[in-house]
Amino acid sequence: MLNNLTPSQQQYDRQVAYWLLLCAVVIFGMILLGGVTRLTDSGLSMVDWKPIKGIIPPITQADWQAMFAKYQQFPEYQKTNFTMTLEEFKPIFMYEYLHRMLGRFIGIIFVLPFLFFYFTKRIAHGLTPRLVVMLLLGGSQGLLGWYMVKSGLVDNPHVSQYRLTAHLGLAVFIYGFIVWTVLDLLAPKLSHPKH
């Protein structure tokens, strides 16, 4: 027989906190992968931004050739990597591809549980606006990432250090914002005795 008692808001807060903690861990991994992408000069290997259609990576040799041909039309290849072979291109492409896919994954693990918690009324009063701000910041981060990459697809094959700093800074801010919210949800609520 099912227990008809609903969990207390404290249990709901804990569920929301664990979900946000998962998001924070994945975002931390994203920041690390972004660093690897930067250090391996992989960020400009994907020269277009297709948030929906760009999910499937090159699979066949013809797919890889087409992707490499696109890359060859841009300054990074023409001025810096003009001796690069297709086999050398594949790893740098995959770093950037994984970075973008992890961004999509973060969006999914944020949005779907958010909708579940929202429609099942498990989000504490007053927390929804904070979660909506997190969602908007996450979307802005994706746009800022593309804005940063675009800066390196012009004559100078290097991303703008200002846009890079903004992209990293926003990632760290989002991470901190989520961790702060997790701690806020998990911290015992202090009750002040009445005098």
Where are these regions (language model features)?
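Interfacial helix-loop-helix junctions of multi-pass membrane proteins
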Residues: 37-46, 143-164, 168
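Membrane-interface helix-boundary motifs at transmembrane edges
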Residues: 120-128, 190-195
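N-terminal signal-anchor transmembrane alpha helix
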Residues: 16-56
